């Protein structure tokens, strides 16, 4: 009987090893996504001087209680190694961003609670998508709470001294931004009550080699649009 227990334990450990260290992170995160993807042109826009030094100081000062980052609801440090905190809608930071979006003609979109992300030396986030998969039970719950993440703006509050770029893996495009710059892209759009996803929106945070990188995630949702 003990032999069967040992064999079963060995199989469990072996499968766990395969999942954690052999399968590429892209498979772990995205193989489940069997959705219709858009073949439309995908573009990433650079927003120069998106934030000034004073605005950045306010945002960083409101960032407290950082915790280890999660992938949806899972702690997967081999996929995402960083710390995050949320900035609620009653903060000065949120009002700064809301005003900027209104001036950009994006007032129809709801904005999720802002997320500050800190990457220390060795910090990274493997290739991933920002949109919620409506065919995934867990992500569907987030979709019902926050709406779909139609667009993303990612701003650099503090660039790393070396490394720490943002790479769009499907189009092999790397952005190495300066303080105050941001990048802006579409994650998906909707046709006849069906979300069409931009497969080329997959992106990753490249490892920080020196210094610290601090970024701001701004997700624009369709919560009140339909």
Language-model region placement:
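Fe(II)/2-oxoglutarate oxygenase catalytic core
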Residues: 2-184, 188-226
């Amino acid at each position: 009987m003990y032999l069967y227990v040992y064999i079963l334990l060995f199989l469990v450990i072996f499968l766990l090893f395969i999942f954690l260290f052999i399968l590429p992170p892209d498979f772990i995160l995205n193989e489940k996504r069997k959705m219709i993807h858009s073949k439309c042109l995908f573009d990433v826009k650079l927003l120069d001087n998106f934030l000034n030094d004073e605005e950045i100081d306010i945002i960083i000062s409101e960032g407290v209680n950082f915790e280890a980052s999660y992938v949806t609801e899972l702690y997967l440090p081999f996929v995402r190694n960083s710390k995050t905190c949320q900035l609620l809608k009653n903060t000065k930071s949120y009002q700064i961003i809301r005003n900027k979006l209104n001036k950009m003609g994006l007032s129809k979109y709801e904005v999720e609670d802002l997320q500050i992300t800190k990457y220390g030396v060795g910090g990274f986030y493997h290739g991933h998508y920002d949109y919620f998969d409506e065919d995934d039970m867990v992500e569907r719950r987030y979709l019902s709470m926050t709406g779909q993440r139609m667009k993303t703006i990612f701003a650099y509050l503090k660039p790393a001294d070396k490394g720490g770029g943002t790479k769009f893996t499907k189009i092999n495009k790397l952005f190495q931004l300066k303080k105050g710059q941001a990048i802006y892209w579409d994650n998906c759009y909707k046709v006849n009550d069906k979300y069409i996803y931009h497969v080329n929106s997959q992106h990753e945070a490249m490892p920080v080699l020196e210094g610290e990188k601090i970024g701001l995630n701004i997700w624009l949702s369709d919560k009140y649009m339909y």
